[in-house]
Structures are given as C-alpha cells and as structure tokens.
Amino acid sequence: MTSTVRIGGFSVSDEAERAREALVALRAEVGKAVVGHDAAVTGLIVALLCRGHVLIEGVPGVAKTLLVRALAAALDLGTTRIQFTPDLMPGDVTGSIVYDTHSAEFSFRQGPVFTNLLLADEINRTPPKTQSALLEAMEERQVSVDGRPRALPDPFVVIATQNPVEYEGTYPLPEAQLDRFLLKLTMPLPSREEEVGILHRHATGFDPMNLAAAGVTPVAGPAELAAARAAVRTVALAPEVIGYVVDLCRATRHSPAVRLGVSPRGATALMTAARTWAWLSGRDYVTPDDVKTLARPALRHRVELRAEAELEGASPDGVLDTVLATVPVPR
C-alpha cells in the first residue's frame, strides 16, 4: 500500500517523494564526474520527466559527452553515442535490412537509435537528410525501415550536441527538427575556479572513460522516472499561468526582430517544462517564476531572427529577455 506524506503543505505519495529525492540527488551524482554545468544537468532531468529531447550547444571540450554518459550511469539506463559526420547515412542511425547467408533470409539489424539515452554528437556536422532520420524517432518513438514500424525502448530521449553555427563544416538544423527538441541548453566555457577543479581531478587520476572509478553509481532508474512522471501530471496549472505562457509566446511573434516566433507546440513545451520544474522544487502548483525559469531553454531555439536583426547583433535570448520584461506577470 502506498502511504502519503505532507511536503510543502500538500499530500504526495511516499513513492513519488522518494522519486523526487532521488532525482534531486542525481545532480550531485553527475557532479562526481562533471564539474559545474548544474543548469544543464537540471535541464536534462526536466526533459527526462517530460519525455522530451534536448539540444546542447557548446564549443568542443566542455564535457557535453561526459555529461550524458554520467547521467546514464546515474540512472542505470542504456546509452549509445553516434558521431555525426558528413558521410553518415540514415541507415547508420535507424538500422537496416541485411541478408543472413546462414539462414538465407533477410533480417533487420537494429541501429544505435535503439537505446534509452541517444547521444547524437555534433548533429550539425551531418547533412539534413541524415539529421532528419531522427525526426520520426523523436516524434513517434519508433522508426520505420522497409515499411515496417519498430518501437523504441522506454524511456527514449535524444540528447543532441552541436557546435555553434559559426564553426566551419556545420549545417543548420531544419526548423521542423529544432521544434521537436523540448529544450536547448547552452554549456559555456568553465569559470577559472571550475577549470582548476577539472585539472585537479585529472591530475589525481580521474578517467572519464571509467565513471565507476569516479564513484558514479545509479541513484534512480526507470521506476523512479515512472513515479515522477505520474506525480508531475498532478501539478496544478492555474488559468492565469496558462495565459501567461500564451502571452509570452504570442509576444515573440510580434517582435520586430523575429521572422518566425514560437508556435503552439513551443507554448506547450514551456508549460510542460515549468510544471516539471515546479514538482522538482517541491510544489504542487506552477508559479510565473517557474515559467520564467524555463522560458529561455524552452523557447530560444524556436525564435528565428530576421537577417537584418542578426546583422545588428540581436539574439534569441535577447528577444526573450525583452518579452519577459514587458509581458505583464499575473498576480
């Protein structure tokens, strides 16, 4: 029997509360391998609970790959890495039909997409045709090969990394694919203090390929994720908060710097992410501050600027800052 406890003034099942505590502890567990980047870790946890996908942008060498590997280890989930290159083919992602000479039959050989956490490394280094191979998997959680749909494991989350677009040899992601990422997270270069900590770890024997030796152990798993997802669905959304989300997204469409603003799908993503953040924070209701906290990661990749605005130095985050400062906040 599942009992209930009082947390922050409301009743939750002890199972859901244990799941929340485990997911909060996940940040510290990942921190055994990754120095800093707390916001990125939190964003990945939010995406897992929302069944959403994440795009991470950062220059090479800021631990994007290590972050995903550490998260998978701390959740006891399967993970596969695909290095996207200019010659990567769609079948290299989804799998293909092969001929078995022993049985004289054709069979399906699964591609690396059949996993829990798929790390699509440097996704913008491969042409759009191969980038789009992930589209069905991200939206439908299945892939179709030779006309037959094949279901992907649950949970299934794509965590794609990309270099900044000004880097040579990169291909901009198609708008349809960008819109299917729940969040876009940025991983900046570390501070001096963090960089000293990174070098100290390596000087004392840290091996990024051996996370167990670094002390990273599973603190949560599929059961905790399922309990947490169920609990998130009970978090209350006041009409005023929903209206605030809509007003923020509509305001992006009227900005003079924007060619294409946030769609209703983007508004839904912001609402869902804010709801999850509220639950992780120990509340059973969403506040406008929750919406503000998630607005940039949930919307920055859905704001397409006019060319002249980009030349003048405008940025999606700058547009969102203006929107957040001007749209009235419900009381």
Enumerate the language-model features and the residues they cover.
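Conserved alpha-helical scaffold flanking the Walker A/P-loop in AAA+ ATPase domains
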Residues: 43-46, 99-119, 148
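C-terminal engagement/docking regions of AAA+ P-loop ATPases
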Residues: 2-13, 17, 24, 69, ...
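Walker A/P-loop
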Residues: 45-85
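P-loop (Walker A) phosphate-binding loop of NTP-binding proteins
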Residues: 59, 93, 161
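Loop/turn-to-beta-strand initiation segments
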Residues: 52-54, 78, 114-118, 132, ...
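Walker B catalytic acidic pair
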Residues: 58, 121-122, 133
